[in-house]
Amino acid sequence: MWDIIIAAGWPIWPLIATSVFGVAIILERFWSLRESYVIPQNLMEDVKKLVGSGSIKRDAVEALRANSPLGEIMAVAIENQNSSLEIIKDSIEEAGSQVSYKLERYLGALSTISTVAPLLGLFGTIIGMVELFSSFTSSGHDVAVFARGISIALYNTAGGIVVAVPAMIAFRFFRSKVDHLVNEMEQQALHLVEIMRGCLLYTSDAADEEDSVDLGGRRII
């Protein structure tokens, strides 16, 4: 491996740095976009119990917010549960936009790497060609310099492709996964709105009944 780096010359180092950065992003996104983390399996059931309990503590909401990206959306909805349905929906949409932005973090950098890497490879190719032609003189040409120029050109061209292709594949994969996760969170959020709607209707009916029937000052929540 070291022999290849030496043969590729100094233009290969920007490509190596780019590849290391790309691998770091790919590993980080694989970890952060786990479905079990973004959308925990039993979270909706826990939220149903929390909403149905009628007594929601601040600590429970903060724990839900820290649980997962979906938990952030659910926590915002619960904080606004006594508001109108329109306000609940608006708060969910706003929280969803923030969560979506977090899920898309670094994907732009990954896309940039897939675009820049071939250009860096092309730059190395040009450097190699310059060195190649410098081997020619009026008295002939230096075979060693000629061979080194070809080596620099080819290794950098290949290096640019090797870095760009995985970065592009990873970008497309993560882009698709984010779309899937966002769609799933939207469905769960809509379900939560229906739950909130049921609770609001129940509370409204209970309040009407309290107005017409003496319940000893007790509120049904």
Please annotate each region the language model reported.
Residues 2-8, 93-114, 144-155:
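Alpha-helical membrane-interface segments at transmembrane helix boundaries
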Residues 38-123, 127-138, 173-204:
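Predominantly long cytosolic amphipathic alpha-helical stalk/bundle segments
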Residues 29, 115-118, 122-129, 157, ...:
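Hydrophobic positions within alpha-helical transmembrane segments of bacterial inner-membrane proteins
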Residues 1-43:
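Hydrophobic membrane-targeting segments
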Residues 144, 148-171, 175:
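Pore-lining and gate-forming transmembrane alpha-helices of multi-pass membrane transport proteins
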